[in-house]
Structures are given as C-alpha cells and as structure tokens.
Swiss-Prot record:
Keyword Nucleus: yes
Coiled-coil annotated spans: 21-50
Entry's family note: Belongs to the DASH complex DAD2 family.
Electron transport keyword on record: no
Gene from which the chain derives: DAD2
Protein name: DASH complex subunit DAD2
Keywords of the record: Cell cycle, Cell division, Centromere, Chromosome, Chromosome partition, Coiled coil, Cytoplasm, Cytoskeleton, Kinetochore, Microtubule, Mitosis, Nucleus
Length: 132
C-alpha cells in the first residue's frame, strides 16, 4: 500500500512537471514573438528618426529661404529701394573705371537692375498642432 501511494505521488508530480513544461514552452514562444516585435519596433523607430531628420532639414531650408523674403518690404517695392542701391554702385564703378564704351550686355544688365525684383513665393508648411 505504501508502494501504491508513492507511485500515485510520483504520477501527480510527473503530471505537474508536464504542465510546468507546457507552460514554459508557451512562455518561450511568447517571448520569442515579443523579441521579434521589439526588433520590428526598433527598426520602425529608426525609420521614424530618419524621416523626422529629413523633415527637420526641409524646415531649416524653408526657414533659410524665408529669410530672403525679409530683404525687401512692401514699401521697398513702392519706392524702388533697389534702384537707388544700383545707382550708387554704378556711380562708384564709374568713378573707379576709365571712360570706356559700354557694351550692350552692360546696358541690358543695368535695365534689369532697375526693374523691381519679383516677390518670393509664399510657402505654408503645417508644422505641429496647426489648427485649421
């Protein structure tokens, strides 16, 4: 009788160990799947970082380009501020140079310099939390 109870105890212990082994295998499979998902998240995070770096570069370029918009104001277009700058440069150049005949290219350049510059194109970029 003691022998049968010992066999029954060992069977219960064996069943318990089989159950623990099955749970361990499930846990191992879930951890492997989690590892794959974490690796994918890491890859996606690197991709997002690259995209954000590209957008940062684009925004910096737009910012630098918009600085050139500040060169002339609307009032400058009305008064022709660029023409007075060009005339001042031409007068200094005429004093420095000897009296030589002007070529047709110089005349064309001078005429183009007297025309008002075209305004820059305005670009609107949605940056963050921009409410429409």
């Amino acid at each position: 009788m003691a022998f049968e109870t010992e066999i029954e105890t060992k069977r219960r212990e064996l069943n318990y160990l089989k159950h623990v082994s099955a749970l361990t295998q499930k846990l191992k499979a879930q951890l492997d799947e989690l590892s794959v998902q974490v690796a994918q998240m890491n890859s996606n995070a690197v991709t997002v970082k690259d995209v954000m770096a590209n957008w940062d570069s684009v925004l910096r370029s737009i910012s630098q380009a918009s600085i050139s918009l500040l060169q002339y104001t609307e009032n400058d277009y009305e008064t022709g501020k660029w023409a007075s700058k060009e005339e001042h440069r031409n007068q200094q150049g005429a004093e420095d140079e000897s009296a030589a005949s002007e070529s047709s290219e110089d005349n064309q350049q001078r005429q183009q310099d007297q025309l008002p510059p075209l305004p820059e194109t305005l670009v609107r970029v949605k940056v963050a939390d921009d409410v429409e």
